[in-house]
Structures are given as C-alpha cells and as structure tokens.
Amino acid sequence: MMENGFSCILIEDEALAIEMLQDYISRRNDLILLGTAIERSEIQSLLRICSPTIIFLDLVIPYGDKNDFNYSKFPESSIFVIISATPISHYNGEIPNGEIHELLKPISFEDFNKCIDKILRNIKVTNV
C-alpha cells in the first residue's frame, strides 16, 4: 500500500477499455494508477519502476511477441483483476499465479467498485 492508497497498473490493449478503466480508477481515492501497458514488451519496463498491489490484466494482449513477457515475472504478492470478454473458465491460455478476481467486459462502474471493495476488505483482514 502506498501512503494515499493502493498502487495499481493497467495492462490492456483496447483504447476504449483503457479510457474507461483509467476513469474508474481515478474515481476512487484508495487507488493510485502507476502506469498502463498496451504491449507485452511494455509490461517488464513498467514492473521495473513499480511493484503494484493490484494488476488489472486483459488476458489477451495481441501486440508483441509471447517471449517479451511471461506471467512468472509479476510480483508474487500482486492481486490480479482479470478484465476480459471471455470468462476465465473458458480461457485456454496462460493465467498468472496468485489471487485472481474477474471482471467481464463490458464492465460497469458498480461491478468495478464491488470487485475493488472485496479486494480491499480481504487485504484489511489479512493485515489485521
């Protein structure tokens, strides 16, 4: 946790989804967006400069070579919010290890808030 809230990064390739999620994150006083990556090659650079508590992750990032980044490079303590049109149960690709929450597109602000509230409650219970 940062002094004024929980740090997060956004990994997403769709412009409208990026804009919407950046707006949702900015509406919450307890979240601090440290950066956004739209290509696999940008993820590692972003993680070199920050260690986010929460990672908003689109599972399908078409830009960049699969060798540019793999999920084992994420901080082990990070909490993942998977943002996708495909439910995780139907996804056949790689999924990161760790605590995972899911938001299906299109994402309403109400669903976003419920997800974040649940994550923050879990963090507070764990830290008690």
Where are these regions (language model features)?
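C-terminal output helix
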Residues: H90, I107-K118
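The C-terminal output helix
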Residues: D117-V128
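A short, hydrophobic beta-strand element within the central beta-sheet of small alpha/beta folds
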Residues: S77-S89
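Short amphipathic alpha-helix used as the core "switch/output" element in two-component signaling
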Residues: D65-S77
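Two-component/phosphorelay signaling modules centered on CheY-like receiver
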Residues: F6, A15-I38
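Acidic, metal-coordinating helix/loop segments flanking the phosphotransfer/catalytic sites
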Residues: Q22, T36-I54, P62
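Conserved acidic carboxylate
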Residues: E12
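As written
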Residues: E94-L103
